[in-house]
């Protein structure tokens, strides 16, 4: 059967179109996916692209969003995280309901390439963050806040961004290691959360690149293998 499918899949575009849904169904089934058979039918170019992306994912950098109301802002943060190479995003909702989707389809497409951790308990969320990251910093203007450019992003760091109206709550600031600010010289001393996140993590990327963190895989091999299979499945659904 697999020889027949191979011949069909490598045939004309018209035949591919006729049988694509059938092949997708077969190779997304639990039995076949356990053996990674869907990856066999991914093009070498696509496999190479996914492998390259995964090799640059940064295990030592994460974003936490606390009670962010607008799903479009969450979607924008996700797209920037994917661009920088952040795999893990933590969404903490202690005051609002969890979002069922993040913005329009075109803007939320980055979500399927990321690992989204949902929490509604701040204490449990921070227990997990402490296992992974040596420093947790919140975006908050205070007398003890450090400048973004003073943060050592060669360490394992998680950055916390608050919602659009109140910022990071006092509860979360008490759980974190400190606060940081993005230096500004304008009249309006605030940025949209998606803009603030982009500015912050591109500084992290700059430091990590200079330190050689993008030159070798950061994620454990078993996680890279798992994500490769997961991403292969998504590619069959697109």
Question: What role is predicted for each listed range?
Answer:
Residues 3-16:
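Short, intrinsically disordered low-complexity segments enriched in Ser/Thr with adjacent Pro
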Residues 22-238:
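Post-transcriptional modification and biogenesis factors for structured RNAs
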């Amino acid at each position: 059967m697999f020889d027949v499918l191979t011949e069909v899949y490598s045939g004309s575009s018209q035949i591919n179109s006729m049988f694509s849904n059938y092949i997708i169904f077969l190779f997304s089934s639990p039995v076949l996916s356990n053996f990674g058979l869907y990856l066999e039918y991914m093009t070498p170019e696509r496999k190479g692209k996914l492998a390259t992306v995964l090799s640059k994912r940064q295990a030592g950098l994460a974003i936490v969003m606390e009670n962010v109301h607008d799903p479009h802002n969450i979607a924008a943060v996700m797209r920037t995280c994917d661009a920088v190479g952040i795999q893990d995003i933590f969404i903490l909702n202690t005051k609002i309901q969890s979002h069922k989707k993040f913005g329009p389809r075109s803007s939320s497409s980055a979500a399927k390439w990321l690992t989204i951790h949902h929490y509604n308990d701040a204490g449990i969320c921070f227990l997990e963050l402490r296992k992974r990251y040596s420093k947790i910093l919140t975006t908050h203007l205070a007398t003890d806040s450090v400048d973004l450019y003073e943060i050592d992003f060669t360490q394992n760091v998680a950055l916390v961004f608050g919602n659009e109206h109140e910022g990071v709550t006092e509860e979360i600031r008490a759980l974190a290691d400190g606060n940081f600010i993005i230096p500004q010289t304008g009249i309006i001393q605030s940025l949209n959360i998606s803009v603030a996140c982009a500015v912050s993590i591109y500084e992290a990327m700059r430091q990590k690149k200079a330190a050689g963190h993008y030159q070798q895989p950061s994620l454990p091999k078993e996680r890279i293998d798992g994500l490769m299979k997961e991403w292969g499945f998504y590619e069959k659904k697109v």
